Amino acid sequence: MLDIKFVRENPDIVKENIRKKFQNAKLPLVDEAIALDAQRRQAINEGEALKAERNKLSKANGPLFGRLKKCADEAEKAEIQKQIDANNAAVKANADRMALLEEQKAQAEAALNKIMLVIPQIIDETVPIGPDDSCNVEVERFGEPKTPDFEVPYHTDIMERFDGIDLDAAGRVSGSGFYYLLGDIARLHEAVLAYARDFMIDKGFTYCIPPFMIHGNVVEGVMSQTDMDGMMYKIEGEDLYLIGTSEHSMIGRVIDQIIPEDKLPQTLTSYSPCFRKEKGSHGIEERGIYRIHQFEKQEMIVVCKPEDSRDWYEKLWRFSVELFRNFDIPVRQLECCSGDLADLKVKSCDIEAWSPRQQK
């Protein structure tokens, strides 16, 4: 999320960024966040002042107790005791007020955090402006799309000819959006994953198998609430979610951690099964394995200094293109427009592979 200090000092920039992402309903949240931050800081400042006063009063009682112990004059003793009692009463009043301020601070922080989670990151100045993916911009093509002079069979038809897939059994066992892979098709699936793994290792990346379930606070750190509700499966009765991509647990690994500069960059390639609620919505494509609830993926993760992030961004998408081209698959790079960017992203591109059967 954005730093509240940045939001407080640059409200106009934050609001303009929200407009660029066509999320005008979020504009009032900027002022709400600033107001909550002011409440939070006021509670902190007053609490610190009261704490200092409490310490001063408590310290003042020490000499008074010493005088009280040595004093023989009853009138003077009564006066000293009166001062001690007054100090104790003030300390108690301070403690009560500090407890109230702590509660107010906690409430303001909780409300502020909820808002900050939905205020989008400031997008890169090179991101094209548009409301949705129809405004994504094609940047470059790699390889020439080929149109065969014969009708290309549907992918599941090919797999069924080799007895390599069983969608009916998967439907009975798990419902739509699942499949069994069998025999050589299953082996081919594993071979492609292994190739992608070794491809990234050869680029100097460290192979990692992460946890496949993560806590809710980690989910909040890697995706918006809307994306979370639309994608993640929650484990009933547990503070655990099945990951939608290993990116979730890999980024979670470094959340709130301080990494020495000499340990950067960290270049990791991670394998995991991925679990998502999404369902097919493209007619005949629903009977295939395009949009499914469970699949496996090889991911690229780089943890680096902010000033190096642009260079690594360029390297990562070029690695993706190179991998596809090694299979002689034509691809194109699409620059995601502002409205298509997830709120946590500053810049992103899609690498789309050519489908001879779909002709797109």
Model feature map: region roles:
Residues 27, 141-360:
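TRNA-recognition modules of translation machinery and tRNA-sensing kinases, especially anticodon-binding
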Residues 1-145, 160, 164:
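N-terminal alpha-helical targeting/anchoring segments
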